[in-house]
Amino acid sequence: GQTSSYRGNAVSFMPEYSFHWHGQSEKLYLFEAPIDMLSFISMHKENWRDHSYAAACCISSRVMYQMMKDNPNIQKVYLCLDNDFAGEIGSKRISEELLQKGIDYEILIPTRKDWNEDRQAACANAPHKSAEFPISEESEDQLCPVLQL
C-alpha cells in the first residue's frame, strides 16, 4: 500500500456539522482540530459538559454559526485557534465577524503551537507514579498473550 501525507477534509464534508459537543451554558469554545478541542477539555475538566465545543477542522466559522443556531443560549464565543500564522489570521477574521454581529467573544491562545502541545507539555511535567510491583517475564506473558497463527 501507499502512504499519503494528505491531511484535509473529505469532499462530502459539511463543515457546519464537524466534531462538536452541545452543552447548555452560554459559552462556546471554537478550535481548529478535534485533538485540540479534546486536549483543552482534558486540561479544563470542571463543568466541561455544561459548555459547547466545536472543532472547525480548519479556520472556518461555519460550525460556530451552526452551533449558535442550534443553541440560542450561547452568548459568548471563545476563539481557541492555534498559536501560528493561520490561527492568528483566523482569530482576527472571526472576531471581526463576531464584533459586527454584536456577539461577545474572547481569544484564548495556547502557550505552544496548539492546545494538544500544551497538554503534552503539561503531562510531561506532571509527576509520574512508579509501579509498586515488579513485573517478571512470566507475569508479562500472562498479561499480554500473543496470538500466533
What residue spans do the PLM features occupy?
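TOPRIM fold recognition
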Residues: 42-149
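Phosphate-handling DNA/RNA-contact segment within nucleic-acid enzymes
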Residues: 1-70
